[in-house]
UniProtKB/Swiss-Prot annotation:
Name the UniProt record assigns to this protein: Tyrosyl-DNA phosphodiesterase 2
EC number: 3.1.4.-
Organism: Mus musculus (Mouse)
Pfam families named in the record: Exo_endo_phos
Location of N-acetylmethionine modifications: M1
Keyword Hydrolase: yes
Region: Disordered, residue numbers: 1-32
Region Interaction with 5' end of substrate DNA, residue ranges: 130-134, 236-241, 274-276, 315-321
Record family assignment: Belongs to the CCR4/nocturin family.
Modified residues (Phosphothreonine): T99
Subunit structure and binding partners: Interacts with TRAF2, TRAF3, TRAF5, TRAF6, TNFRSF8/CD30, TNFRSF5/CD40, TNFRSF1B/TNF-R75, ETS1, ETS2, FLI1, SMAD3 and ACVR1B/ALK4.
Statement: the UniProt record of this protein carries the keyword S-adenosyl-L-methionine: no
């Protein structure tokens, strides 16, 4: 203990100290078990292998998913210990490939030889989406559904939440026209995808939320787009009504970080905030120079609710709830960034009878005024 009396320092060794630490130890062990179960599920989905065999290969590779996947796929073909399908179990006849293998496919931007943008830098587009990687049901088909949206809209930037390691590995393989920056490497996390040849990555920073119970943080990425400097941010703020106080603390951290960027830098935050409107009011509202894109556009009804259990039955919740959990905040020099449109994506059911996620994604287009 850094400070305090000797009696304070000795307290944890007594019965009261042991009793106080027991719940924390139990919670830590429960979290560890949950993370490893999640790793096993994701590994089995990607590897197309018997789930009962997964823990052993992960243990042999220190529970490092990427290392374990590499070791697994490099096993000799005559090794009968791991009956498996071809390396990517996501693949099917209806598979949507984001690697732009078809030379005639113009939906994915390829980097230009000169390194200059291939499109008008006065307009930028992005998608923010909680892709619900924690739901293992129909995950391969749902991942293809998300990728088909990326191929269709070809956004400059993609903000993702609830990404798991196998999903990230899949994106790195299939979304080869994007640079992927993640907020973590284990459990579940956020990610920001930057279109190569269009968005130049400069640096990244991860801001921890010290009191989170759900592995949440703030991912910040500094980029250059069309000669303009941007600070891109995403987060998945604490979930559920019971964690409102922590969510408000996290929102204050986000807004504070948005104010730290130089005045000449445009700041965009997009993510799953889990916010209720009254929580923004409790936080003191948005700063005068930070705007909510949906409110800026006149609060259009067609894209108000991004989590709607009546329209989206992925969670099979009998009651009907709808919230504007997914939000976009921006800070720019006056008049230099103007939202033009905001739409929901991922609205079509897949062949499996489910949507790509329990959240709708948000597609936003903005004009950059020099």
């Amino acid at each position: 203990m850094a400070s305090g009396s000797s009696s304070d320092a000795a307290e944890p060794a007594g019965p009261a100290g042991r009793a106080a630490s027991a719940p924390e130890a139990a919670q830590a062990e429960e979290d560890r078990v949950k993370r490893r179960r999640l790793q096993c599920l994701g590994f089995a989905l990607v590897g197309g292998c018997d789930p009962t065999m997964v823990p052993s290969v992960l243990r042999e590779n220190d529970w490092q998913t990427q290392k374990a996947l590499s070791a697994y796929f490099e096993l000799p073909e005559n090794d009968q210990g791991w009956p498996r399908q071809p390396p990517t179990s996501f693949k099917s006849e209806a598979y949507v490939d984001l690697t732009n293998e078809d030379a005639n496919d113009t939906t994915i931007l390829e980097a230009s030889p000169s390194g200059t943008p291939l499109e008008d830098s006065s307009t930028i587009s992005f998608i923010t989406w909680n892709i619900d990687g924690l739901d293992g049901c129909n995950l391969p088909e749902r991942a293809r559904g998300v990728c088909s949206c990326l191929a269709l809209y070809s956004p400059d930037v993609v903000f993702l939440q609830e990404v798991i390691p196998p999903y990230c590995a899949y994106l790195k393989k299939r979304a080869a026209s994007y640079t992927i920056i993640t907020g973590n490497e284990e459990g579940y996390f956020t990610a920001i995808l930057l279109k190569k040849g269009r968005v130049k990555f400069k640096s990244q920073e991860i801001i921890p939320f010290p009191n989170t119970k759900m592995m949440r943080n703030l991912l910040c990425v500094n980029v250059s787009l069309g000669g303009n400097e941007f600070c891109l941010m995403t987060s998945h703020l604490e979930s559920t009504r019971e964690h409102s106080a922590e969510r408000i603390r996290q929102l204050k951290t986000v807004l504070g970080k948005m104010q730290e960027a130089p005045d000449s830098t445009t700041v965009i935050f997009a993510g799953d905030t889990n916010l209720r409107d009254q929580e923004v009011i409790k936080c003191g509202g948005l700063p005068d120079n930070v705007f909510d894109a949906w409110e800026f556009l006149g609060k259009p009804k067609h894209c108000q609710y991004t989590w709607d259990t009546k329209a989206n039955n992925n969670l099979r919740i009998p009651a009907a709830y709808k919230h504007r959990f997914d939000r976009i905040f921006f800070r720019a020099e006056e008049g230099h960034l103007i939202p033009q449109s905001l739409d929901l994506v991922g609205l079509e059911k897949l062949d499996c009878g489910r949507f790509p996620s329990d959240h709708w994604g948000l597609l936003c287009t903005l004009n950059v005024v020099l």
